Structures are given as C-alpha cells and as structure tokens.
Amino acid sequence: MPKRLVCTEAKTVGWQEYELPGKLEPDQLRVRNTHGAEKHGTMAAFVHGHGNKRGQWDTDRQLFVPGGIAWSYPIPLGNMQVGLVEEVGSGVTNYSVNDRILYYGAFAPSAVIGRDNTWKLRDDTPWKTATCLDPATVALCAVRDSGLRLGDAVAIFSLGAIGLMAVQLAKLAGCHPIIAIDPLAHRREIALKTGADQVLHPVGMDVGEALREATGWRGVDAVIEYSGAMEAIQASLRAVAFGGNVVLGAFPGPMKAGLDLGAEAHLNRPNILFSRNDSDPQREHPRWHNARLRATVHRLIMDGLLNAESIVTPVLKFTDRLAAEYDHVMSAPEKSVKFGVEYEDSTR
C-alpha cells in the first residue's frame, strides 16, 4: 500500500498508508507524481505546534474560538505536485492520459484528484517554477492589494518563496527601486538575481531610515511584509511614504509588546492592509478573485516570465529518509527557501 508524508502530531513527521479508489468519479483524474514542493511558512506553523494556539476559526461568527483547533492531525505534508495523468474520469474533457499536470496535494507517489484547481503544463515547463504557483499567487494578491503602479518604489520584507516571487512580480509591474530585505545572505543574493535593485541586511541598522534615504527621503510607495516580525512591521511604518500602503501577509504567532503606532504611522497616515488570496471576496471583487489570481500566475509561468530555479532548493528524494529530512530542512532557513521532492519516476 502506498504511503504519504504526514505530521502525526506537533513536532512529529511520519508516514501514513493510504488507498486510492479503483474506479474514478466522472470529474476525477488519476495522477502519478514526478515532483513536488512544500509550503514552508504555513506548514511550519502546524508542524512546530503553534498554528492551533488561537483555537478554531468560526466561519459563522468570523473569529477564532478558544479551545478548538484550526487543523486536526494527522496533517498531510506537501503543497504542490507535478505529475502525469494516468486515467481520466468519464466527464473530464480537458485532460488526456500522459498529460503533465500541476495540482495542490500532499507528498505521495500517486493521487486521485478532482479536475478543479489543476493546471496543464508543457513538457518544457520547469517543475520548480511550476510548483511555485502557490507562493506566486499569494505574492500577486499582495502586489495588487498594495496598489503598486509603474515607477513606484517598493520595499519587500522577508525573502521566502512569497517575498522572492513578489520581487519578480514587482519587476514585471515596472516598479523602481525594488528594495528587498532579509537577514539571510543567500536569499538576498537570489533577490538580486531575480529583480531587486537593492538589498538590505536588517540586523544592526535602521531599515526604515535606509529605505527613506534610498528614495530621496520620500519613502517607498508601498511595503510588502511577509516576515510577521514586529521589528519588520515597525520598519515598514517608518519607511513608507505619506499616505502609502503597508501590506501585511504573514501568518505569525502572537507578537510581543512594543509596536509603536504613534510615531511615523500617526504623522504619515499610511494604509495598513492585510492580504490573503484565499479570503474571497478580494478587494477588487467581483473582477478579481482567487481563481483569476491563480490563472494569471499560471499564464506567467507558461510564458516564462517567472523563475524559481534558485528558490526550490534543496531537492530531496521521496524515500523513507524524507520524514527525518523534512524537519531538518524546515528548521534551517539559512540553507533552504522552499524544498522540493523528486519521485522515483521523475523523467518529465
């Protein structure tokens, strides 16, 4: 029986056997996976045990309810998978056997999935870039929420997969300068290679002042902040221009005391916006929604306008060692941005 990678409880990664249906429903596909990638920020919150501390989200009251849980264990691990279609349901007309496909799913050698939220890939589409459709969609939502326009100056805090994709999208939007901030040297290097005009090491410096100086003391038109760190949010408020936008998109734990909303924020009156692509309706409803964001990113990937070759690293083999390697890689941001997985048959 095949096995998939799961988080069985907080801080414990292991394997779970699963069984696939013998007969497909009309709208289903049977897929054999070749490559995959993880979603570091969100999954780390649950693997490390702090993702459930706020309780359960109550959809009727639109708030967290203490005492419940957001996700129950075991939690399947893995974010996006690339695979080959082996069988199609009777109602599926947009896929054929041997088509190359991208979809949301867990690390597993095979899967049966619905046809919704799947994307066809060419044989020459790089799998690493394809599996970054998810962080690029999150980044595109943040870029649109920020109101960035051609010629705008932008600061991007935290160069994980989302931040690095935001750098590329800001470049495509014609922003200048694009200033990327992260304490990890290899992430700053990737940002420079993929569109940033300047990078900053935030440790031991006044980042807000540096960003203002880089823009002739005007301040950046928008900030996209994905670290969730109080210090980064404070620097964002210090750096943004009068009336500019600060977009917060991270999923952090509760912050410590000390955020000062009475300094630059009070005088320069920036707009503080929270961004989340999965929270439909979007600010630009009804024209924009999550499905359109994903379709736009898929087109950018297929047109070769996004590049994740230096983002998805390291690439691990789908073997019994993966459970032990998972936590090691997820706990070493200085060595990895977004790790990938290669399955036994990965020729396409």
Feature roles, as predicted:
Residues P76, Y104-D116:
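A structural motif shared across PLP-dependent enzymes of the aminotransferase-like
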Residues W71-Y104:
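A glycine-/small-residue-rich N-terminal strand-loop-strand element
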Residues R100, P126-G204, E209:
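Mid-domain Rossmann-like dinucleotide-binding core that forms the NAD(H)/NADP(H) cofactor-binding site
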Residues L148, T194-L273:
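Glycine-rich cofactor phosphate-binding loops and adjacent beta1-alpha1 units
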Residues L237, E284-R348:
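C-terminal hydrophobic helical "lid"/dimerization subdomain
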